[in-house]
Amino acid sequence: MLSFIVSIIAKEIQGQHREVSILLGRVNINLDLKKLILFLAISVTVITFLNGFYSSYQVQKQQLQSQTLKNHNAYAAKLVSATDRFLLAAQQQLAYSAKILAIQFNDANTLAQETQRLRLQTDSFNSTVVVDKNGVVLAHSPLSLKLKGQLLESDGAKQALANKKPMISEPYISAVGNLVIVISHPIFNSQGEYLGYIGGTLYLKQKGILHDLLQVHFHKDGSYIYVIDKNRRLLYHPDVARIGEQVFGNPVIEAVLRGESGTRQLINSQNIVMLAGY
């Protein structure tokens, strides 16, 4: 009888143990499920936040790039206009001097005074020169160039003598070794006879009004300006050593040479990512 009771008690204890085990299992399952749900909720929240942050970053980046491109394009257009006005004013100064010299072309003092006045009056030119129809220098400023009486055979001089009209030369190396552009105006007497020309030079690697105009700008974000001619040659660059260099493989330069204007992001010839306006 006693063994029977013990047996029953043992069975009851085993049954209770199984019930407790089942309950604990259910509790563990519930806990694991809650952890899983919590983990998923946190994961979704984090992913949603990161996605929103990335989307916001991309939108702001695109807006910033778009605004930067517009600013660069507007600034480039403004500089082009200012440069055109400078060159027009320089040509007008030379035209006025040509009228004066046409009357007194044989007066050496007048030639010397006019070249000096033209160079010093506005600082438009780094040097000025009067050349006769044979290419011989009659007067120049500054006198330190020591060109008087010399026959000029530079590309700019040959162009001016051949064209016999107002012109702006292509860049070339001058007789004294400077990389220059010459703005010239022909001199004709009252009978229409060609006497020669008066020219003003812009030294591309030295200071002057044009150089200062291009060098000084108000963007302090690492932006810079460069100017090219139709032969892809750099006429202005903040790295003076690159002035005169021909640049190939730059899509912005190619677009400019096709007469286009606009904006774009590109990798330049130095493998630097740029936002360019042109």
Where are these regions (language model features)?
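Short hydrophobic/aromatic beta-strand element in the GNAT-like acyltransferase core
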Residues: 127, 184, 275
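Extracellular/periplasmic ligand-binding regions of membrane signal-transduction receptors
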Residues: 73-78, 82-113, 133-144, 204-205, ...
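Extracytoplasmic/periplasmic ligand-binding sensor regions of membrane-associated signaling proteins
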Residues: 120-124, 133-213, 263, 267-270
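Extreme N-terminal signal-anchor transmembrane helix of membrane signaling/transducer proteins, especially
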Residues: 1-14, 18, 23-62
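Short, intrinsically disordered, charge-balanced linker/junction segments flanking boundaries
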Residues: 253-256, 260-265, 269-278
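Solvent-exposed, extracytoplasmic
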Residues: 107-124, 153-155, 159, 193, ...
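Juxtamembrane interface helices immediately C-terminal to a transmembrane segment
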Residues: 38, 52, 56-75, 79-86, ...
